Structures are given as structure tokens and as C-alpha cells.
């Protein structure tokens, strides 16, 4: 069976799968502001699964906006763990907050569930290769001074970087900002598809409903399709895949049965996805599942979202044959195109 051990921040690692936490946090903006730095630098001593008491544990003050921003950080953390002292006034249930914050909390908690395919793959990578999900910005550019000047920025897996908001909204603009170092290349906003040129420091401003999460060009991000939302922990029959323009890219989705030894290759199934981009256009391929296909659905529906690519695909094929039942739609949120394929055999 898979086991884990929850240990406090003062403890060094003494278990194969430790889940650390930053201690009994106070309910203050200052405490929230420390958590992104504490979370990312925990990776420096092998604490890849690091958590914090989302919303704060005790003392401090009541602030609904603070809770919303802390939940946003928690969703883009290794562990998403809402927690508080045993006090009826400190509960973290979304319905205990004002309507706006309740909506924000619910939306982000659902987003966490969507992210499970990506997160599960990244945690397998951490187990096999020792590369933590959350990494400080200087991990990839250790010679770059700017990466040390943004302690609250971090990479979130291979495809994303995060710059949490830890300040209150400006009462005039209704926005709050986060100092951000954008690495070289083109990066896209995870929530709205806006493109940013990298190699510079910027202040990214967002309302209460969003936070700065950027995706590198050429990325492929597998998500659970939340249509007909449920709390199932089974490998999803419907996947939503975000495909970003620019460079060619590749992502290998890894899945297992969830209750088998993770160190044995025969317990895993992999699905390789590639995107090739050149002057002739973009080709996106989902290869047939490889490995223990019994642990994943035998048929899957795919919702492919091409961010900032508005042209309708010239052709969709399955097993080399034109797939005439493909559905197409405009993706207004990410300024692109959606392609839907239903009930595709896993070995196709």
C-alpha cells in the first residue's frame, strides 16, 4: 500500500514519502506572503510534498479576501489542505464566507480536481527522478540574478510557473499585483490565454477571481474534463487537454490503479502526446496507450483546446482514418479552437 507521513516544519526528512507543513500559521496577510517562498524552498531539502494550513490556523483576524488568496495558492501547491484550529469561527467551508469568496473557493477547488492528471504525472516524475513539483525559479536559471529576486515565484511542474497574489485588492482598481520574473520565451496566461514575452520582470495584476499562472509556449497540459462533475478518483473517461502555440512540445501522461506499488513499471499505463509546430502549421498527436491499459478506461473522450490557435483543423484522424464525428467550437476563454472526439479506443 502507499503510505505517507505528515511532519512539522521543524522536522527533517525521515520517511520515503514525507508530507511536511509550515507549522501553525497565523491568519494574517504577512503569514500568507511567507508561504510561497517557504513552499518552494522546502524542495531544497527534499520536501517535495510541502503543505500549509490554507486560510491560516489560528490568531490573526477574519478576512474573507485573505482566505480566497490562500486557497488559490493552495490549489497550486503540492498539497491542497484546508485547515484551522478547532474553533467554529475559523472553519474553511466555502459557504462560511461572502458570496464572492465562496464562488472563488469553489471554482479553485474544482480546478484542483481538474489538475489531477497533470499532478499525478508530476508526482510520478518526482518519485522516479527526484524532481519536485514545486521548484524555485533559480533551479532552471541559477546564474540569473533576477530569479533570486522573486522568492514568491515558482515552477509548478514542467509546464507552468506561478506568482501568487499575497496583497489586498486596491480599493480603486479592484486589482492586486504580484512581482513576477517571466523566463525567456513566450508564456501564456493559464486563465485567459494572454501572451507575455519573457526575459523580464513585470507586475501582474488580477482581480479576486484569478491569479498569475503562466504556461510556457509549446506546452501540453492534461486535465480532467469536468463536464458532468463528480468526485470520482478513478482515472477519468473524459480528458481535457490544453495545447499551447509556439515551440514543439511533448507530454507523457502517467496513470495507475491508485492502490498498487508505484515503483513497479507493470502497474503503470502511459499516453504520449506530441505537438509539432513549423511553417506548415501545427500537428497534435495522441498516441495509443502503452503498458498496463487495464488500469485506464478502454475508451476515452477527448476535448482538445488549442490556445490562441483559431483556425479550424484541416483534418482529424483516428488510426489513420478520417474521424468524421469530430466536433468543433470556438474557445472564447483561451482565444482558440476546441476539438472534441468521443469514445476513442485507448489502443487507437
Provide a role label for each language-model segment.
Residues 1-2:
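Short, exposed "boundary/linker" segments that immediately precede the start
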Residues 5-6, 344:
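Hydrophobic beta-strand core residues of beta-sandwich domains
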Residues 7-210, 214-216:
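Catalytic-domain carbohydrate-binding cleft regions of carbohydrate-active enzymes
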Residues 81, 92, 96, 106, ...:
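Context-gated lysine
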Residues 157, 184, 279-281, 334:
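Residue-level signal for tight coil/turn positions that link beta-strands
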Residues 188-208, 315-343:
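Solvent-exposed beta-strand/loop surfaces of large extracellular or lumenal domains
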Residues 213-321, 337-347:
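Accessory, solvent-exposed terminal regions and/or long lumenal/extracellular loops of proteins
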Amino acid at each position: 500500500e502507499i503510505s505517507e507521513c505528515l511532519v512539522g516544519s521543524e522536522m527533517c526528512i525521515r520517511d520515503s514519502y514525507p508530507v511536511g507543513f509550515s507549522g501553525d500559521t497565523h491568519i494574517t496577510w504577512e503569514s500568507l506572503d511567507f508561504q510561497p517562498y517557504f513552499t518552494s524552498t522546502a524542495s531544497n531539502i527534499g520536501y517535495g510534498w510541502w503543505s500549509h494550513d490554507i486560510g491560516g490556523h489560528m490568531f490573526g483576524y477574519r478576512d474573507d479576501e485573505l482566505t480566497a488568496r490562500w486557497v488559490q495558492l493552495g490549489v497550486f501547491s503540492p498539497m491542497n489542505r484546508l485547515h484551522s484550529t478547532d474553533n467554529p469561527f475559523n472553519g474553511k467551508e466555502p459557504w462560511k464566507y461572502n458570496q464572492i469568496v465562496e464562488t472563488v473557493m469553489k471554482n479553485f477547488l474544482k480546478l484542483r480536481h481538474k489538475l489531477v492528471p497533470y499532478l499525478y504525472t508530476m508526482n510520478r516524475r518526482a518519485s522516479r527522478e527526484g524532481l519536485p513539483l514545486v521548484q524555485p525559479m533559480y533551479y532552471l536559471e541559477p546564474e540569473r540574478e533576477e530569479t533570486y529576486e522573486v522568492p514568491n515565484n515558482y515552477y509548478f511542474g514542467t509546464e507552468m510557473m506561478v506568482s501568487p497574489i499575497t496583497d489586498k485588492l486596491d480599493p480603486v482598481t479592484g486589482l492586486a499585483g504580484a512581482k513576477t520574473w517571466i523566463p525567456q520565451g513566450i508564456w501564456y496566461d493559464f486563465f485567459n490565454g494572454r501572451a507575455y514575452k519573457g526575459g523580464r520582470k513585470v507586475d501582474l495584476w488580477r482581480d479576486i477571481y484569478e491569479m498569475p499562472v503562466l504556461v510556457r509556449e509549446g506546452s501540453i497540459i492534461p486535465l480532467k474534463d469536468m463536464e458532468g462533475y463528480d468526485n470520482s478518483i478513478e482515472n477519468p473517461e473524459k480528458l481535457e487537454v490544453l495545447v499551447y502555440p509556439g515551440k514543439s512540445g511533448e507530454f507523457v501522461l502517467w496513470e495507475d490503479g491508485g492502490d498498487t506499488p508505484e515503483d513497479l513499471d507493470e502497474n503503470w499505463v502511459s499516453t504520449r502526446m506530441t505537438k509539432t509546430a513549423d511553417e506548415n502549421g501545427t500537428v497534435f498527436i495522441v498516441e495509443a496507450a502503452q503498458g498496463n491499459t487495464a488500469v485506464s478506461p478502454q475508451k476515452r473522450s477527448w476535448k482538445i483546446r488549442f490556445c490562441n490557435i483559431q483556425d479550424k483543423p484541416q483534418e482529424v484522424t483516428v488510426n489513420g482514418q478520417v474521424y468524421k464525428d469530430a466536433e468543433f467550437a470556438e474557445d472564447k476563454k483561451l482565444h482558440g479552437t476546441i476539438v472534441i472526439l468521443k469514445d476513442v479506443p485507448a489502443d487507437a
